């Protein structure tokens, strides 16, 4: 293990992201915290709503959502990380998402 090598990961229960001002505040908060990976729970997005979550510097955003406006999770991976995604497994009800890959 190399001393000084680390990865920062944050997670947050957002209790719904259907309000534009809340999404904007969340994007600012994520940029301020500056993690490499961010996990979000309770996004309350439906599959057609996922395009609404955008954070500058974060192009890799993975969602798992149900058909109703409840549950929903997302994993955001910063553009600062050179990662290779091998597999993404999503729960159809939006309770979990698993990403397999390498950094």
Language model features with spans:
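Short phosphate/oxyanion-binding micro-motifs
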Residues: 1-103
């Amino acid at each position: 293990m190399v001393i000084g090598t680390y990865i920062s990961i944050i997670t947050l229960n957002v209790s719904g992201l259907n309000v534009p001002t809340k999404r904007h505040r969340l994007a600012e908060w994520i940029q301020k915290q500056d993690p490499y990976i961010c996990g979000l729970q309770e996004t309350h997005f439906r599959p057609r709503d996922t395009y609404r979550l955008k954070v500058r510097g974060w192009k890799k955003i993975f969602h798992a959502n149900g058909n109703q406006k409840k549950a929903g999770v997302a994993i955001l991976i910063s553009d600062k990380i050179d990662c290779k995604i091998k597999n993404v497994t999503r729960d159809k009800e939006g309770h979990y998402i698993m990403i397999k890959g390498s950094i």
